[in-house]
Regions:
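Metalloprotease/metallohydrolase-associated module, dominated by Zn2+-dependent proteases
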Residues: 11-27, 32-65, 75-185, 202-302
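Membrane-proximal N-terminal segments immediately preceding the first transmembrane helix
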Residues: 69-71
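Active-site recognition of the HExxH zinc-binding catalytic motif
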Residues: 189-202
Length: 302
C-alpha cells in the first residue's frame, strides 16, 4: 500500500501565477493546532518547535541567498551537475540536493525526523516513465511477517521530462509559479515542492498540493507562487516531430513499410496498424499494436 503526492503538470495555458499568502505570522501553526490530526510523535513536535516548521517565513532576499548557495554547492560538488543544463543526473545528486536543502532550511532535522519515524533513511529515485508529474513523494507501507507495518519515504523525479526541457521548445518553463532559466533551476523547484509534501507526510501522514496549508507552506518557505509545472511532456515533445494522438504515421518494421494511427504518446508512441488478424477495437476494426520510438515515425498522408 502506498500514498503518493506529485508535482502535477499544468494542463491550462500559462498565465499569471495565483497569488499565495506569504504569512510571517503564526497562522499556519494556529491552523495546525486546531486540526483534529495531532503530530505523530513528541520528537516530531520538538522538531517543528525547533525549526518553527508550521509557521516559517523566509524573505525573498533570504530565499534567493540560500538557493544561490545551494546551486553553487551542487555545481561545485556533483560529478554530474557541472553545468546548469546538465546531461546526466544520479540518485546521489538528488540525495545531495535534498541534504543541502535540509541543512539550509530545516537545520538538518527533516532527514532526522524521517529516520526517527520509519527507521529508514529517505530514498530517492529517477523515473523515466513519469509523463505528467515532475516529481512524486511516496509513503510506502508494508506489513512485515511480524505483523508490524514498515513505512518508508521516497522522492522520485521525472528525469525524462527534465531532459526534454530546455532543448528545442522555445517557451517559458514555469515550475511552482516561478520561471526557470535552466534545467538545474527546474530541478531545484521540483525538489522544493516534494520537500513540502514530505514535511506534511511526516507530520500529518497526508499531503495535498491543492490544499491551502500546502500552498502557504510552499510560499512561506520557498517563495512558490504555484503548485504545477510546465516542463515539456512527451506529447509536446512528439509534436516537434509532427506527431500527435490521432496522427497518421508511417514506419519501417522488419523490412516492411507500415502505416497506422497514433493512439497514445508516452516514452514511445503507441501506433495501431489495421490488420484483419489483430484484436478488434471499439471502432469495430482490427489492429496490431506497435510501440515505436518517435524518431522512427514520420507523418503520412493516406
Amino acid at each position: 500500500m502506498e500514498a503518493s503526492h506529485a508535482l502535477p503538470h499544468c494542463r491550462k495555458p500559462i498565465k499569471e501565477p495565483e497569488t499565495l499568502v506569504r504569512d510571517p505570522s503564526c497562522r499556519l501553526r494556529q491552523l495546525a493546532e486546531n486540526t483534529s490530526e495531532p503530530l505523530w510523535t513528541t520528537g516530531l513536535r520538538a522538531m517543528t518547535d525547533s525549526v518553527d516548521l508550521l509557521s516559517p517565513y523566509n524573505s525573498p532576499e533570504d530565499i534567493a541567498a540560500k538557493t544561490t548557495a545551494i546551486r553553487q554547492a551542487v555545481l561545485r560538488e556533483s560529478d554530474n551537475l557541472k553545468q546548469p543544463n546538465f546531461e546526466c543526473v544520479s540518485t546521489e545528486d538528488l540525495a545531495r540536493l535534498f541534504g543541502l536543502y535540509d541543512r539550509t532550511f530545516f537545520k538538518g532535522l527533516l532527514a532526522q525526523a524521517v529516520k526517527a519515524k520509519t527507521g529508514q533513511p529517505l530514498a530517492f529515485r529517477l523515473s523515466s516513465t513519469m509523463t505528467r508529474s515532475g516529481g512524486k513523494t511516496i509513503l510506502y507501507r508494508r506489513r512485515m511477517p511480524s505483523r508490524k507495518v514498515q513505512a518508508n519515504y521516497e522522492i522520485a523525479v521525472a528525469s525524462r521530462m527534465l531532459f526534454m526541457t530546455f532543448k528545442q521548445v522555445d517557451r517559458p518553463v514555469v515550475v511552482c509559479g516561478l520561471t526557470c532559466k535552466d534545467r538545474l533551476e527546474a530541478l531545484h523547484r521540483i525538489m522544493e515542492h516534494e520537500i513540502i509534501h514530505l514535511v506534511e507526510l511526516v507530520i500529518y501522514g497526508k499531503s495535498s498540493c491543492s490544499a491551502r496549508r500546502f500552498k502557504e507552506l510552499a510560499a512561506n518557505v520557498f517563495g512558490h507562487a504555484g503548485t504545477t509545472h510546465a516542463l515539456v511532456t512527451p506529447g509536446e515533445h512528439a509534436a516537434q516531430y509532427g506527431i500527435r494522438v490521432g496522427s497518421t504515421v508511417c514506419f519501417e518494421f522488419e523490412g516492411r513499410r507500415l502505416i497506422g494511427r497514433v493512439n497514445r504518446v508516452n516514452r514511445r508512441a503507441t501506433v495501431l496498424v489495421e490488420d484483419a488478424k489483430g484484436p478488434r477495437y471499439s471502432d469495430g476494426k482490427n489492429y496490431h499494436k506497435f510501440y515505436m520510438p518517435l524518431k522512427r515515425l514520420s507523418p503520412a498522408s493516406v
